[in-house]
Amino acid sequence: MTPFLNETHDLFLKSWVESANAPDCDFPIQNLPFGVFQRRESEEPARIGIAIGDRILDLTCCIKLRLFDHLPESLKNACTATRLNSLMALGSESASLLRSTVSQLLRIDSGQSPPEANILVAMTDAELLLPAEIGDYTDFYASIFHATNVGKLFRPDNPLLPNYKYVPIAYHGRASSIVPGGIPICRPQGQRKPPDAAVPEFALSRMLDYELEVGCFVGAGNSIGQPISIDRAEDHIFGLCLVNDWSARDLQAWEYQPLGPFLAKNFATTLSPWIVTLEALAPFRDAAFQRSNDDPQPLPYLFSKSNQESGGFAITLEVWLRTEQMRAEGMAAVRLSQGSFSQMYWTIAQM
């Protein structure tokens, strides 16, 4: 699938939601990420929303006010669900139609004066929830730099295993411990074996670590035994989010052989509550990672000319630290790391 720009990406678009037009706004009208929220101190069920400025567009309210009457019934029904699963399952064409509709509704030149108080909820008045019911998830080892650095911790003489450059390496994670951002994480406990100890001990982890990752929500699925070709893979992708893959390195070092990590990884995974659609990311598409001349080329089923040309994403990712004590003392956050998602060895379509 080749990403295309359309009118929703126009840099000159402005919204009648004033906060969305601020230069440093995370949610301008060109973004329009999807999420699920619940009004604070309300017994109403969760609702699907779209972030715009410092507000959330309530899709259920839009349906009730007949602002989306031209949309297909299946899409309107999906907009009133309490999770994004039904909407994502409709596929990329439906997601694109909804994005276009919302973009037109929120434009300052739309010619409409919708009842703002009824369709918008202040971010401060909402609790952000997990955007979808996640029955399963796969954790890929897509950065060759990360794989090499972590490999050095456990295999200094052989950090990168020979299969890495041939097949996207992954393992299944624990879906039941996925939480949205803002939920406190408990320090895990398990077996750890200090280098100078003869036997392991059971204790709290002393090497709790973070991993900055990008999550990918799969929408429309496929039948068992029917593979999805690399050229059609992105038709099944709804959008991306941020992920913190919490890791207990001391537990991991002891337990990971021979089948890989388990308790060191399954205690918590944090997701950002907003999903940015692939269509919204079209202006940031990039070529796939350029392998060195010594590296093998992908096997035919993992190779596509269009994927090589635009399978990457030119997204800069950062990790900032601001502890409770730093906040109490009015200290500024400290940046721990910065990297580019375009440096992933494997593209999303290949994975």
Language model features: what each stretch is:
Residues M1-E7:
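Charged, compositionally biased non-catalytic regions
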Residues T8-S42, A51, L57-V334:
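Active-site microenvironments in enzyme catalytic cores
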Residues I48:
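Short, surface-exposed charged micro-motifs
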Residues S340-M351:
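Extended C-terminal subregions enriched in glycine
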